């Protein structure tokens, strides 16, 4: 299945939570989800009781859309999470957080993950001084993520950095240098996401 190209705000309403897909608009009263926080469509306001399977599937879809990953990418990450030591659900969240497009967003270089994905794909981002244009690239502790020298004059990036956003504890930002550093691996308490990851594990365990 290809990437979704329809109205992004409908995805937030479908999943019942803000996915922060439209940047600054998501933080204002203009956000459609803030005004209509129910599912789209004729029967969107009706309360439907989900089956256990339906709840598991909903959590998976929610997580996929939050990070903007496709089904096959998600499956590969889940398989890797299973092979890692520790709790599979938390491992999965850690891998998703470590994606370069997510880190570019978390550091504030981009206003949304889709925008961050575009910055990476268009070659505006470096990791340890080398251009990386793969959004799914996984960062590790010690990595330095920076905006390329020739891209630092972009109004988009400068405006994004002027907005005050919380940078998670596992990352460190130097606004003046247009760079951030991965201090440690992200832990579950660093990920402020209302996801019941154990439901996703149950789904894949069937």
Curated annotation (Swiss-Prot):
Instruction: Return one Gene Ontology term, BP aspect.
Output: translation
Give the Pfam families listed for this entry.
Ribosomal_S4, S4
Q: What is one term from the GO cellular component aspect held by the record?
A: small ribosomal subunit
Entry-linked CDD domains: S4
Ordered alphabetically, the record's keywords are: Ribonucleoprotein, Ribosomal protein, RNA-binding, rRNA-binding
- Out of the domains of life, which is the source? Bacteria
The cross-references to PROSITE patterns, in alphabetical order and at most eight, read: RIBOSOMAL_S4, S4
| Molecular function GO terms recorded | rRNA binding; structural constituent of ribosome
Task: State the InterPro entries in the record.
Answer: Ribosomal_uS4, Ribosomal_uS4_bac-type, Ribosomal_uS4_CS, Ribosomal_uS4_N, S4_RNA-bd, S4_RNA-bd_sf
- Residues forming the S4 RNA-binding domain are 98-158
Question: Its biological function?
Answer: One of the primary rRNA binding proteins, it binds directly to 16S rRNA where it nucleates assembly of the body of the 30S subunit. With S5 and S12 plays an important role in translational accuracy.
> What does the subunit section of this Swiss-Prot or TrEMBL entry state?
Part of the 30S ribosomal subunit. Contacts protein S5. The interaction surface between S4 and S5 is involved in control of translational fidelity.
NCBIfam families assigned: PRK05327.1, rpsD_bact
The similarity annotation says: Belongs to the universal ribosomal protein uS4 family.
Q: What is this protein called?
A: Small ribosomal subunit protein uS4
- The organism named in the record is Thermoanaerobacter pseudethanolicus (strain ATCC 33223 / 39E)
């Amino acid at each position: 299945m290809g990437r979704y190209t329809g109205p992004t705000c409908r995805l937030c309403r479908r999943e019942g939570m803000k996915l922060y897909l439209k940047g600054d608009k998501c933080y204002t009263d203009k956000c459609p989800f803030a005004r209509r926080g129910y599912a789209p469509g004729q029967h969107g306001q009706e309360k439907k009781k989900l089956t256990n399977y339906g709840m598991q599937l909903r959590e998976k879809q929610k997580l996929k859309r939050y990070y903007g990953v496709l089904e096959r990418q998600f499956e590969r990450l889940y398989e890797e999470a299973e092979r890692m030591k520790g709790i599979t659900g938390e491992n999965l969240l850690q891998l998703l957080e470590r994606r370069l497009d997510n880190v570019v967003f978390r550091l504030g270089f981009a206003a949304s993950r889709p925008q961050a994905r575009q910055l990476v794909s268009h070659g505006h981002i470096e990791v340890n001084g080398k251009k990386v244009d793969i959004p799914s690239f996984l960062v590790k502790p010690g990595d330095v993520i920076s905006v390329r020298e020739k891209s630092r004059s972009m109004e988009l990036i400068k405006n994004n950095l002027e907005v005050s956003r919380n940078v998670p504890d596992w990352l460190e930002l130097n606004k003046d240098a247009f760079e951030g550093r991965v201090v440690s691996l992200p832990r579950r308490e660093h990920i402020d996401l209302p996801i019941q990851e154990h439901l996703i594990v149950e789904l894949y365990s069937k």
